[in-house]
Amino acid sequence: MADFFNLKARQQAAAQASSSKTPTSKQESNRLQPWVEKYRPKTLSEVTAQDNTIQILSRTLQSSNLPHMLFYGPPGTGKTSTILALAKQLYGPELMKSRVLELNASDERGISIVRQKVKDFARQQLSVAPTYNVMTEDKDGGEAKMVRYRDKYSCPPFKIIVLDEADSMTQDAQSALRRTMETYSRMTRFCLVCNYVTRIIDPLASRCSKFRFKSLDQGNAVRRVDDIAKLEDVKLDAGVSEELVRVADGDLRKAITFLQSAARLVGATQTAGRKKKVVVDDEDEMDIDPPSAPSKTTISLEQIAEIAGVIPAPTLASFSDALFPKSAAKSIRYNEIAKVVENMIAEGWSASQTVSQLYEQVMFDERVEDIKKVRLAGVFSETDKRLVDGGDEHLAVLDLGVRVAGVLCMG
């Protein structure tokens, strides 16, 4: 009871209680962080395979004269990473929070967001740049030295609003955004990020400088995957990096996610049984894995195929064989097709993955004549649209099989 009035004794008791808990260390936090975020480019020079775009933006970075921008291209090519890296080099860590607003337009796509959140941020006065000194490194590898914040980061007199997946915005929201861009262009710059530039209305696109992000070539993507695997001390079998890029269809973000999933799968057997208790609060505890030791097991091609949901070659071959006529009568073997499709759906294979792999299997088969390939292209495109529209997967794949078999049986 006497210790209750002793402030020093109470502080010591609180310190001992907090030290008895096992906090999540910085190393633990980094281990649990998605590799996509962990290895996101911090500067423009770290962005891969977009040389022309990076060259133009680097010139803009030096002059601090930024136009409204429109980044478009396939997913996983570095569009969002590029604008965030540019903003970090312009403002530094202190001004990023107050000068940059990032919105995912696929979640907040209505006109109310443009009228409220975007407009409110655009009309805000600029925050003052810090006056203290920061540490900087010599580009030639010399010793670090202290410089003013404004000398390291240019801190131009405008804010940046990043609208990710802007092609998901409604027409009304895009029209409202056009007026907002005109009104607050003196102190705000907009960067629209999208996959399909045709879904951006012309009045909005004409106000922006367009930057096309091309799909990463095989060499750059494989090199980046190998670098991350080396940094994470993950061992890969021969050809695994190339397979990761192939199953990801050039999407580097997806390839890195597959790599992390495979690394966790390989290390699961090693970390099992070595879990430790972490005190979350005064009563609750949580089991977490300790930082895993360097993996002695390598990631194989079979594990990548399993994680990516790639249909095994024997399963796909049985489906394609059922589509080709066996006899001279050239009749559709419906029962065989229906049985194979039923088994594939029961095993849980994705219908979209089935369509994608079957397309490559059939369209690149030398036994199929060119005139038939023209008709098959229409069949595959119709099935793909039905799946996108939410059609039943079993019926869509069965219909695809029957229609493809019908084209192949034609004389």
From Swiss-Prot:
GO terms for biological process: DNA repair; DNA strand elongation involved in DNA replication; DNA-templated DNA replication. Residues 11-27 have a biased composition (Low complexity). Pfam families: AAA (PF00004), RCF1-5-like_lid (PF21960), Rep_fac_C (PF08542). The keyword Cell membrane does not apply. It comes from the Eukaryota. The keyword Nucleotide-binding applies. It is found in: Nucleus. Its main location: nucleus. GO terms for cellular component: DNA replication factor C complex; Elg1 RFC-like complex; nucleus. Heteropentamer of subunits RFC1, RFC2, RFC3, RFC4 and RFC5 that forms a complex with PCNA in the presence of ATP. Belongs to the activator 1 small subunits family. The elongation of primed DNA templates by DNA polymerase delta and epsilon requires the action of the accessory proteins proliferating cell nuclear antigen (PCNA) and activator 1. Subunit 2 binds ATP and single-stranded DNA. This is Replication factor C subunit 2. It comes from Phaeosphaeria nodorum (strain SN15 / ATCC MYA-4574 / FGSC 10173). The lineage of its organism: Eukaryota, Fungi, Dikarya, Ascomycota, Pezizomycotina. The gene is RFC2.
